[in-house]
């Protein structure tokens, strides 16, 4: 959990033990992603359904990075073969069963409910999280663009058309695929 104040930052992880490195990596990278997104938010409230999806995908991307570079990590001296545990942890997350909440969301009211419950009901966004993770893997140099999302926020939705028109980048086009297609919003 990320706690911010005027002069300090505190991150609390809920891991059974600090040597469960895969979970520590996942949770810490998740909270650091929140921190970066909030630093670029201009004081605006976060768009929970979108931000949680981004941060979960980022955590998976960082797990992949640690798996690929484990030999370079000082922790590998304690357990050289732990890279396989990181890989399994990542695969288990990726292959999680998911609901269809975000994909089947058709109204602003449904999206507000889903957003409010987004931290608790993560399974409703797993499909979208995996899409974003795959986008991150295919376009790693463009990941930094996610910090711009608040500029294109329009209440509970993101104006991807404006973002795409301004950025003219395939990364934003791909990212827009996870946005619910609401009936009452153009």
Model-based region annotation:
Residues 25, 47, 51, 124, ...:
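Hydrophobic (often cysteine-bearing) scaffold residues that line and stabilize catalytic clefts
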Residues 25-42, 52, 56, 60:
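Active-site recognition of the HExxH zinc-binding catalytic motif
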Residues 35-39, 57-69, 134-139, 178-181, ...:
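Structured segments of extracytoplasmic/periplasmic soluble domains
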Residues 96-186:
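Pan-zinc metallopeptidase signature
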């Amino acid at each position: 959990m990320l706690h911010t104040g005027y002069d300090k930052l505190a991150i609390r992880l809920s891991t059974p033990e600090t040597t469960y490195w895969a979970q520590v990596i996942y949770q810490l990278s998740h909270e650091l992603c929140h921190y970066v997104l909030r630093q670029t938010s201009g004081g605006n409230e976060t768009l929970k359904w979108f931000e949680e999806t981004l941060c979960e995908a980022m955590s998976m991307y960082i797990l992949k990075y640690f798996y690929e570079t484990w030999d370079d990590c000082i922790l590998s001296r304690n357990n050289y073969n732990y890279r396989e545990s990181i890989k399994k942890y990542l695969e288990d997350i990726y292959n999680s069963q998911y609901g269809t909440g975000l994909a089947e969301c058709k109204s602003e009211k449904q999206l507000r409910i889903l957003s409010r419950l987004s931290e608790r009901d993560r399974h409703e966004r797993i499909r979208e999280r995996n899409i974003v993770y795959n986008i991150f893997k295919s376009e790693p140099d463009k990941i930094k663009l996610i910090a711009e999302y608040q500029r294109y926020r329009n209440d509970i939705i993101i104006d991807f058309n404006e973002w795409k028109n301004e950025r003219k980048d395939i990364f934003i086009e791909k990212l827009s695929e996870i946005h619910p297609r609401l009936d009452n919003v153009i």
